[in-house]
């Protein structure tokens, strides 16, 4: 298993080059595309993670698939990752890069979980309110979690604001149990 420090080292190297060339936002988007393909395409992931396939073969495939779709900077970064046999750790490298890029661009990532998909207008309103409250640009990551029953659970960094129906029901249940035990004891 790769150390997070190594993922951060790769991310920092790419971040510094992207920032130096003024391509931070573009590289962030391109890396997101590549990692999304890696995470969702099981054939691509199996190919990339297969240690029997040489780095030069992987580079040829990457070039044929990504050339013209991503910047030379991202393509070269992927070549280095392949050469060093760090392919399975691409998602953690991306997350570390994204953290650095968000910090540099004054963006805070907010995870919003809801029982049903958020309407576009609701998402925009929530984003605007959070931007005002946090004083930073907000990037919403929405996720549908039917187990919440209703309401929202919003995570900003290590802070969770849980307004879900499930949590309200759990708290109500705890209060009822507590009140019932007080009645029995009294």
Swiss-Prot record:
Homology family: Belongs to the ATPase delta chain family.
Ion transport among keywords: yes
Primary gene name: atpH
Chief place where the protein resides: membrane
Subunit structure and binding partners: F-type ATPases have 2 components, F(1) - the catalytic core - and F(0) - the membrane proton channel. F(1) has five subunits: alpha(3), beta(3), gamma(1), delta(1), epsilon(1). F(0) has three main subunits: a(1), b(2) and c(10-14). The alpha and beta chains form an alternating ring which encloses part of the gamma chain. F(1) is attached to F(0) by a central stalk formed by the gamma and epsilon chains, while a peripheral stalk is formed by the delta and b chains.
Function: F(1)F(0) ATP synthase produces ATP from ADP in the presence of a proton or sodium gradient. F-type ATPases consist of two structural domains, F(1) containing the extramembraneous catalytic core and F(0) containing the membrane proton channel, linked together by a central stalk and a peripheral stalk. During catalysis, ATP synthesis in the catalytic domain of F(1) is coupled via a rotary mechanism of the central stalk subunits to proton translocation. This protein is part of the stalk that links CF(0) to CF(1). It either transmits conformational changes from CF(0) to CF(1) or is implicated in proton conduction.
Pfam families: OSCP
Top-level taxon in the UniProt lineage: Bacteria
Protein name (database record): ATP synthase subunit delta
SUPFAM superfamilies noted in UniProt: N-terminal domain of the delta subunit of the F1F0-ATP synthase
Keyword Cell membrane: yes
HAMAP family: ATP_synth_delta_bact
InterPro entries: ATP_synth_OSCP/delta_N_sf, ATPase_OSCP/dsu
Subcellular localization(s) per the UniProt record: Cell membrane
Keyword annotations of the record: ATP synthesis, Cell membrane, CF(1), Hydrogen ion transport, Ion transport, Membrane, Transport
Record GO cellular component, one term: proton-transporting ATP synthase complex
Molecular function via GO: proton-transporting ATP synthase activity, rotational mechanism
